Amino acid sequence: MTDTLMNADPPRRIRSFVLRQGRITASQKNALENLWPRYGLDPAAAFDPAAVFGRRAPLTLEIGFGNGESLAAMAQSLPAEDFIGAEVHPPGIGHLLIELERRGLDNVRVFRVDAVELLENCIPEGALARILVFFPDPWHKQRHKKRRLVSPAFARLAASRLAPGGVFHAATDWEDYAMQMLEVLNGCETLVNQAPDGRFSERPAYRTPTKFEQRGQRLGHGVWDLVYRRS
């Protein structure tokens, strides 16, 4: 299981991430081997949330959860809801698996897959109560901006997977990316900006500050939250 999880690489196309062979600890590797069967899901298999979680509950997807601490904290604070996380980097997945076991959580499952492919192939239309995209790679060099996750096509795809009234919430500490996301998301006809002035929102209580946010604040960066509802 560990070798498959660490070496699997989806078919090539323009992606919002680059797979790097990051350092993985012994405990993370052990978690991938022993906890993946409990928490991991196969993106090639049919996904039935009621069957996976044994109940019907609001379902949140976090895309690119990093080390998973924010996702685990949210799942613990909202035990009546269910959560799925999509990440491609094994060290972060291993870290989350350890955290899920430590907290005794059973309302989280994990995919190792490109989020676009997950939305296209696994998640039915209208299935999600929330989609969270916290601190995606800003790809700040001009030649790399085509790799940014939040694009018009992605916004339409994500909106289609939200139930009516469902929330799309993105956050970034790169102002240039924040402005691009604002333009893209405000241009999606099925998403309604929840900020009073139609721009940026205050950080909702359910989003605990991440290590990326704290790092950005130490560097003097601002943080921009964008919160939308599916019409």
Swiss-Prot record:
Listed PROSITE patterns: SAM_MT_TRMB
Protein name according to UniProt: tRNA (guanine-N(7)-)-methyltransferase
Binding site for S-adenosyl-L-methionine: 62, 87, 114, 137
InterPro entries per record: SAM-dependent_MTases_sf, tRNA_(Gua-N-7)_MeTrfase_Trmb, tRNA_methyltr_TrmB_bact
Domain of life (superkingdom): Bacteria
Pfam families assigned: Methyltransf_4 (PF02390)
Gene that encodes it: trmB
Alphabetical list of HAMAP family matching this protein: tRNA_methyltr_TrmB
Enzyme class: transferase
Keyword field: Methyltransferase, S-adenosyl-L-methionine, Transferase, tRNA processing
EC code: 2.1.1.33
Record pathway: tRNA modification; N(7)-methylguanine-tRNA biosynthesis
Higher taxonomy: Bacteria, Pseudomonadati, Pseudomonadota, Gammaproteobacteria, Methylococcales
Catalytic reaction annotation: guanosine(46) in tRNA + S-adenosyl-L-methionine = N(7)-methylguanosine(46) in tRNA + S-adenosyl-L-homocysteine
Active site: 137
Residue positions binding substrate: 141, 173, 210-213
GO molecular function, one term: tRNA (guanine(46)-N7)-methyltransferase activity
